[in-house]
Amino acid sequence: MLDKKTDILLAARKLFSEKDFTSVSMQAIAEECKMSKASIYKLFQSKEDLLLELLSFNQKQMVAAASRLQENTALTPEERLTQKVKMELEGFRRNQQFFNMLTYGNPKLHNDRVKQHIHQTRSTIICWHRDSLIQAYGETILPFVWDLVIILHGMMREFLMLIKIEEKPLELDPIAEFIISTLNQIIKNRETRQSLLPPEAIELYIHSASSYKPKDKSVLLSESLKELHKGISSLSAADYDVDELTSAAAMLEEEAKKEEPRAFLLKSLIGYLEQTGVLTQPVSMLKTLLIT
C-alpha cells in the first residue's frame, strides 16, 4: 500500500511540475501511474487531499536529505551548507511548476486547508534555512541570524528566477558556492553583532510564512505545542521512545509557560526532541519562538 501511495505522489508531482495543479486531473494522474482512477480515490478523497499529502511528502524528503548531509562528517560545516543550497536549487529545477505554485501561486486557486498547508511548508523552509545557517556558522550568528536568512532568501529567489527562464541549463555548483561565499563575507565584515532589523519586523517576517496574518506569540506557541504532541502520538512505539518524548514535550510546555523560562532547559529539551528527525516543523517553530 505504501509503495502504491508513493507511486501516486511521484506521478502527481511530475504532472504538477510539467503543467500546474489546476490543469492536472485525477484521471491524468491515474494514467501516469498506470492505475485506475478508483484506486487513487481509495487513498485520496480529492485532488486537494493528494496535494496536502504531497506537500508533507516533499517536506519529509527535504528534511531527510538535509539530515543525511548534516551527518556527513567528511564535509566541513561550510561544505554541508553549500550542498544543501545546491540540493534546493536542483529540487526546484526538477519540479519547477510545483515550486512556482508554492512560492508564487495564486492563493485564490486553493481552499483554506491547502492554503494553510502551503503557508506551513514555507514556514518550515524558513526555519530550515535558519537552522542550516546556525549549524554552519555556530551560535555566534544568533543575534543577526534572521538578517542572514533574508539575505539567503533574496539570493536564492533571484537565482531560482534565472533557473526558471534559463535556455541552457546553468551550472549549480558555482551558484551555490557564490551564495555561501557572499554569506561568508557578510559575516566576516559585519561591523555590529546585532540585527539591523527591529524585533517587530523579524516577528512579522517569521509569522508571515506560517499564517495569513501575524498572530500573537502565545497563540503560535500554543499551536506549535499542540502540533508537537500530535506528532509524538503518531510515532511508532517500536521505532521511538514515545513515553520519553511525551515527557519531554510536557516539560517543555510547562517551562515555556513560566514567566521566566530557563533558557538552558528549553535548549536541552528542544535539542532532545530535534534528534528524532521527524518532528521538524513544530520543533523548528518552537525554537524560533522560545530561543531565537
From Swiss-Prot:
PROSITE patterns reported in the protein's UniProt record: HTH_TETR_2
Superkingdom to which the source organism belongs: Bacteria
Name of the molecule in the record: Uncharacterized HTH-type transcriptional regulator YcnC
DNA-binding region per UniProt: 25-44
InterPro entries recorded: Homeodomain-like_sf (IPR009057), HTH-type_TetR-like_transc_reg (IPR050109), HTH_TetR (IPR001647)
Organism: Bacillus subtilis (strain 168)
Presence of the UniProt keyword Cell cycle in the record: no
A Gene Ontology molecular function term of the record: DNA binding
Residue ranges of every copy of the HTH tetR-type domain listed in the record: 2-62
Keywords: DNA-binding, Repressor, Transcription, Transcription regulation
Family annotation (PANTHER family): HTH-TYPE TRANSCRIPTIONAL REGULATOR RUTR, TRANSCRIPTIONAL REGULATOR, TETR FAMILY
